[in-house]
C-alpha cells in the first residue's frame, strides 16, 4: 500500500478500529485505509501489485472499495467530509482532508490514524487525544455529541456496544 500510495502521490493512512486494536493489543482482520484522493483507484492499483491479484469489490454508492488479502479485509476510501439532513441517514459527501475524515468518525478512539507513506510511515495522527481516551478507557465523541449523534443516531448504540465489549466508560458529556 505504501509503495502504491507513494507512486500515486496520495497521502494515505490506516484509520479506525484497526489502529485502536493495535494499541489495545487486540487482533483485527478489518483494515480501513483512507487516502486524500481516489480510494477506489488506490485499491485497484494495490490489487494489481499483489501476487494473487485479489478481486476489488467496488461500492460506488459509498465511494469505497474492498479487497481480501490472506485473512484480511481491506477497505479503501477517499478522505471525505460528511453532512446529514435531519430527516435522512444518507450523508452528503464531499472530498476532504485526513482531518475532515477524522472529524466524521464516531469516537476519538476510532479517529486514530497511522501514516502509510514512506515520509510518515507509522506516525500517529491523533487530533482528539484518542490515545489518552484508550489509556483512560473512555468512549467520547470527537465533536460535540449533539452533532455526532444527530448525524447518525445509531452511534449511540455503538457507544454502548464499545463500552460493553472493551470495558470502557462513556464520557459524561457524551452520555448527556
PLM segments and residue spans:
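Catalytic cores of the polymerase beta-like nucleotidyltransferase superfamily
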Residues: 1-176
